């Protein structure tokens, strides 16, 4: 039961008692045949009178909530507007599901989905369930006092023309919801609970779904030469981990995989270049990129995706102590390239550098996508509703952009020009880990690009969308779980065979 909500299906002709009865109307307030039957004459007349008195016009994402009259199979009537015919032609079913779940709350409801000049496909209904599950998510396990409604679980019964025709798509959507919820849970966890070793242990539970999991400890990282990642970790009492997840779902096991790489800084104090106190508590979410990768692997394995996908995350804690790495240190990365440390708070790119190099050298992927809450500069550039995309490949960039648009997780492609690469040249090493005040998101991407060889690659800077992002109809959580829906859509459309 993903998202704390139970969802079932029944035919349009079904009848029931109690709970909410949800119907949809356009801006003409016309009811579909099935909705009229469910409401009966008393309910239909009440809706017409109430709409007139409340000036309810059926606009998109508007609602009218009424006590049900005698003779109607419900305790409440919830009438949700879908807007004009033009609005109804471009319904975002995921958002509609979230909006509906928000109006129902922690109650049981029957939702009549049909008519109004459109046919809801199995995919539409599945997207509706996805939105409802994501809206119903709560992270409250550390609260000792809960409201009664927090203890209750919502239950939606969707009335559709053919229940059996939508169940397979709905199961796939539930797998995606579970992946998003896992990612949200990971981001929301406090860092004293989700330290690197514990994070790696939780990821190892994906083996129950058929995912192969390998954990690299400090000894192994030293053996292969992950000097950049280890430098970041050396100020923490908690040892770092690198976790490799392998989902081999393609018919051809030898087919090169898609590789997803995530930054997993479970807490970022800034290290010796320490952050200011205000807002530092949010730095538990500096592992949002890794959470998206873990959530995506969970989703792909749960729905048995026909694709080979590698997930790799570098998990560290960036802390200041007597052993911490310092500005002016020079560290040697796994690639052999040397890095002059200018700012210890630019640590995520050091973590990603070693993981990117390890993945491309070991697994020979057909493409690599990394996700990271990497820079505050991307928030200045794009705000908190869209992620920054940097890429060395137009085709991959286009696929990611289209998948994000379809999934409701939008990206905007940013430039990668030689000037950004030149900005990270160092007098003392092969490169430095910051490029100055200007173009911070772009110079960070240019740094990562130095760890990518001849393979299509994209970098998603999700600092604005991964945590504390704008609330929406499908997300009221601090940790958004951003990226799981985009990556699942990308795999579904371009990598499954």
Swiss-Prot record:
Q: Fetch the InterPro entries from UniProt.
A: Leucine_aapep/pepB, Macro_dom-like, Peptidase_M17_C, Peptidase_M17_leu_NH2_pept, Peptidase_M17_N
Provide the alphabetized UniProt keywords.
Aminopeptidase, Cytoplasm, Hydrolase, Manganese, Metal-binding, Protease
Provide the cofactor note recorded for this chain's UniProt entry: Binds 2 manganese ions per subunit.
Manganese found in the keyword field: yes
PROSITE patterns with a match to the protein in the record: CYTOSOL_AP (PS00631)
Q: What cofactor does its activity depend on?
A: Mn(2+)
Catalytic activity field: Release of an N-terminal amino acid, Xaa-|-Yaa-, in which Xaa is preferably Leu, but may be other amino acids including Pro although not Arg or Lys, and Yaa may be Pro. Amino acid amides and methyl esters are also readily hydrolyzed, but rates on arylamides are exceedingly low; Release of an N-terminal amino acid, preferentially leucine, but not glutamic or aspartic acids
Q: Where is the active site?
A: 275, 349
Q: Give the subcellular location.
A: Cytoplasm
UniProt GO cellular component terms: cytoplasm
Residues bound to Mn(2+) 2 are: 263, 268, 286, 347
Under PANTHER family, the record lists: CYTOSOL AMINOPEPTIDASE (PTHR11963:SF23), LEUCINE AMINOPEPTIDASE-RELATED (PTHR11963)
Q: What does this protein do?
A: Presumably involved in the processing and regular turnover of intracellular proteins. Catalyzes the removal of unsubstituted N-terminal amino acids from various peptides.
| Protein family according to the UniProt entry | Belongs to the peptidase M17 family.
Q: Which HAMAP family match?
A: Cytosol_peptidase_M17
Q: What is this protein called?
A: Probable cytosol aminopeptidase
Q: Organism, per UniProt? A: Methylorubrum extorquens (strain PA1)
């Amino acid at each position: 039961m993903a998202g704390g909500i139970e969802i079932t299906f029944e035919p349009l002709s079904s009848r029931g008692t109690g709970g909410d009865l949800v119907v949809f109307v356009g801006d003409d307030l016309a009811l579909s045949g099935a909705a009229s039957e469910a409401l009966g004459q008393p309910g239909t007349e009440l809706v017409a009178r109430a709409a007139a008195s409340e000036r309810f016009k059926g606009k998109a994402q508007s609602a009218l909530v009424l006590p049900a009259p005698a003779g109607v199979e419900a305790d409440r009537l919830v009438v949700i507007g879908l807007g004009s015919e033009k609005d109804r032609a471009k319904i975002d079913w995921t958002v509609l599901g979230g909006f509906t779940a928000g109006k129902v709350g922690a109650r049981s409801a029957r939702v009549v989905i049909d008519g109004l000049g459109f046919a809801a496909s199995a995919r539409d209904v599945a997207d509706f369930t996805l939105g409802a599950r994501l809206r119903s998510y709560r992270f409250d396990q550390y609260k000792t006092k809960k409201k009664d409604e927090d203890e209750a679980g919502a239950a939606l019964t969707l009335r559709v023309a053919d229940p059996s025709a939508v169940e397979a798509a709905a199961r796939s959507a539930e797998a995606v919801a579970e992946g998003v919820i896992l990612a949200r849970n990971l981001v929301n966890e406090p860092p004293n609970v989700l330290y690197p070793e514990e994070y790696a242990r939780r990821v190892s539970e994906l083996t129950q779904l058929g995912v192969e999991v390998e954990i690299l400890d400090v000894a192994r990282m030293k053996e292969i030469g992950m000097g950049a990642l280890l430098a970041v970790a050396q100020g923490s009492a908690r040892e770092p981990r690198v976790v490799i997840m392998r989902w081999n779902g393609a018919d051809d096991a030898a087919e090169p995989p898609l590789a997803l790489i995530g930054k997993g800084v479970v807490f970022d104090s800034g290290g010796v270049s320490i952050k200011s106190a205000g807002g530092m508590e949010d730095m538990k979410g500096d592992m949002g990129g890794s959470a998206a990768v873990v959530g995506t692997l969970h989703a792909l394995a749960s729905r048995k995706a026909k694709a080979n996908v590698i997930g790799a995350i570098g998990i560290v804690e960036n802390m200041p102590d007597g052993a911490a790495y310092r500005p002016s240190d020079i560290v040697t990365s796994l690639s052999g390239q040397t890095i002059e440390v200018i700012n210890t708070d630019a640590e995520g790119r050091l973590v990603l550098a070693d993981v990117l190099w390890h993945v491309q050298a070991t697994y020979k992927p057909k493409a690599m996508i990394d996700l990271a809450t990497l820079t505050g500069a991307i928030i200045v550039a794009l705000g908190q509703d869209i992620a920054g995309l940097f890429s060395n490949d137009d085709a991959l960039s286009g696929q990611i952009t289209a998948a994000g648009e379809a999934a409701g997780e939008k990206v905007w492609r940013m430039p990668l020009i030689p000037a950004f690469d030149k900005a990270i040249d160092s007098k003392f090493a092969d490169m430095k880990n910051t490029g100055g005040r200007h173009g911070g998101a772009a110079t960070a991407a240019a740094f990562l690009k130095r760890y990518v060889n001849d393979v299509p690659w994209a970098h998603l800077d999700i600092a604005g969308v991964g945590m504390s992002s704008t609330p929406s109809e499908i997300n009221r959580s601090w940790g958004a779980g951003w990226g799981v829906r985009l990556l699942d859509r990308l795999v579904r459309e371009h990598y499954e065979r």
